[in-house]
Amino acid sequence: MNTQRKSKHLKTNPTIVASSSEEVSSLEWEEIAMAQEEEDLICRMYKLVGERWDLIAGRIPGRTAEEIERFWVMKNHRRSQLR
């Protein structure tokens, strides 16, 4: 019975995300402002550990892994457009 109610709810409410792994388009992202020190640390950590955003976020107080990944993607997307 609970699964029937859940599937009905998913059909009537299109704003529910079916999977946490879905990507959000860049149009829905707000630009993340980072201090220069944060940017430097993100760049250095990325060179060391790659896309381990949780690990990088653990070194920057007040920042989530999602914010750092979004910042990285947007920053590198802008660089590729400038080339």
From Swiss-Prot:
SUPFAM superfamilies: Homeodomain-like (SSF46689). It is found in: Nucleus. GO terms for cellular component: nucleus. Transmembrane segments: none annotated. The keyword Transcription applies. Gene3D superfamilies: Homeodomain-like. Residues 35-72 form the Myb-like domain. Pfam families: Myb_DNA-binding. Keywords: Developmental protein, DNA-binding, Nucleus, Transcription, Transcription regulation. CDD domains: SANT. It comes from the Eukaryota. Expressed in developing trichomes and non-root hair cells. GO terms for biological process: negative regulation of trichome patterning; root hair cell development. The keyword Aminoacyl-tRNA synthetase does not apply. Its main location: nucleus. One of its GO terms (molecular function) is DNA-binding transcription factor activity. Overexpression of ETC1 results in the suppression of trichomes and overproduction of root hairs, as observed for CPC, TRY, ETC2 and ETC3. MYB-type transcription factor involved in epidermal cell fate specification. Acts as a negative regulator of trichome development, by mediating lateral inhibition. Promotes the formation of hair developing cells in H position in root epidermis, probably by inhibiting non-hair cell formation. This is MYB-like transcription factor ETC1.
